[in-house]
Amino acid sequence: MRTFLPFLVLFVGTAACSAAQTSSTEFAGDPAGGGPGAFGGASNGANGDADSGALAQPGTLTAGAWDDNRNYDVFTDYLSKHVPQKIPFAHDPQTTAEDAAHLLFAGDRTAKALLDVAIVIDTTGSMGDEISYLRTEFQAIASAVGARFPGAQPRWSLVAYKDVGDEYLAKPFAFTANPADTQAALGTLSAGGGGDYEESPEEGFKALNQLQWRSGADVAKLAFWIADAPQHPWRTQAFADAIDGSRALGVHVYPIAASGADEQTEVSMRSAAQVTGGRYLFLTDDSGIGGTHKEPLVPCFFVTKLDRAVARTVAIEMTGTYEEPAPADIIRTGGDPKNGRCLLGNGTQVDVF
């Protein structure tokens, strides 16, 4: 079985506008609004502000996180019960890709010395807010990463992607050691195009795989894919192939589900995270801005500010060991985490992330 190195990529998805939107920029999510996790979260998130175009300050967005490799039985149960379309990843005849990833990524990992970071953004019509939020949050996140790991020589890159028939399918920006260059590149992007719910994330991943990543076992490489829509059903194999390409490079995909994400979006995101050794992140209504965010079908999680969640995941990748958020950073929980675990109603325990 091959082993893969971890890389850092940030994906921001923007599904197209339609009459089903809850605001001028986002599709409707769960009509019930943010609530406890599917297995009984501790509290409900506040409903999102109806004015999703309101300007956010740095450190405003909130998010939870979940690790399907540490909780593989929950993941396989989820796939068996809730999967509209399973992702056909490549695998050896002796095992599935998911089983192989679980064996590789379930425990502690090797510490890394260097860091490559790519931001991949879906720039179709419905997530103009998320592009704006990313511009607001990015510099603070980059500064926090640089301050904690000054010797990691972090490099930043950007890939914008749209949908078939739009102005472009993917627009990559080369790696740079200066976060200000990436901030400037973000400023050139605008939301537009699309036309239906599904988009073309496979094109973003294909462009991601062509970036000039640093090689070596001491390089940490992650992927944060912020989106509110999955791939087109007829492009699922192409999506799986692109994720397999990222996996072969050692890219760890960290999806971040935005408002309007449906069940197939969660399936695609969690599958991409699990098979590459990333974790699943999801925006929540606790920020009070944007549209309604779907509560994921995961039983145990902490909600913190998004910038803290991203910084924590980078730290875990760089050090190779798990760390919980600081108690002061926890806004609420899904489930009742105690000593790093939640006890479910059926008597089993799961690990919090």
Residue ranges and their predicted role:
Residues 6-10:
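Hydrophobic helical h-region of N-terminal Sec-dependent signal peptides
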Residues 1-4:
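Positively charged n-region of N-terminal signal peptides that target proteins for export
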Residues 18-353:
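Divalent cation-coordinating acidic motifs and surrounding scaffolds
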